[in-house]
């Protein structure tokens, strides 16, 4: 009887050792996609990712708690890339984007969570958030090929999963050894965008129109860096880009005029029809000034009064 009992206890001891080695934790993060990003807006863009964590216990365990530490190394300021172009961002542990997600190796704080063994079953789960924010003010981030451009950064070896099981007092993250990785990718799609504004063009006051009258105004164009743009100006009230007309306020007269893309006033600015051309350029991510050259040609002087026209500038990109 005694011999049988000794064998039974020895068998249980072997079973306990094997089960102890089966206690493991895993971490599965979601990729973080910032979606479409308009760099010329110059604003920060924030998104949230999740990490699903599962810890397993033996059926009978003297360590009913597990501390899981998610280490992320590399620089505090991170950068997504497309070729040689980059876009800076940060990864954080809090929604306020103040606590950087780091690693014990680099002296920063990893994301950590404690999970308790459930009363029923042997697997405990937890979900934690991580937060990303694209740094504001990166207005010169370019696109390529005049198309939306994906920037990304992948994490693999930079991620270190560490965990430890305990009874009452949790170990420190720094004391735990690496037990694997949790790869994920951060990405954003930089889109082409343009903003345009205009100042009015005034030919001033004239008694007679015996000679041509010149004047200029300007457009301010801000387009995504490396994105080609093209500006058309419609025919205004006449509806004819090749023969623009200012009308007298109250009626009873008109003045012919034209707009040009060049200072010599040889290239009429329109929509590409009727012998007209359009202004073209490439965005820099910063405001670009585009001059509008106007001329009232010599013509029969109309009735005195105030003459004007309204035209619309349209930018394509």
Kindly give the residue locations of the regions a language model identified:
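N-terminal signal peptide c-region/cleavage motif recognized by signal peptidases
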Residues: 17-19
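Positively charged n-region of N-terminal signal peptides that target proteins for export
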Residues: 1-4
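N-terminal small/polar-rich segments of proteins
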Residues: 21-81, 124-125, 129, 134-251, ...
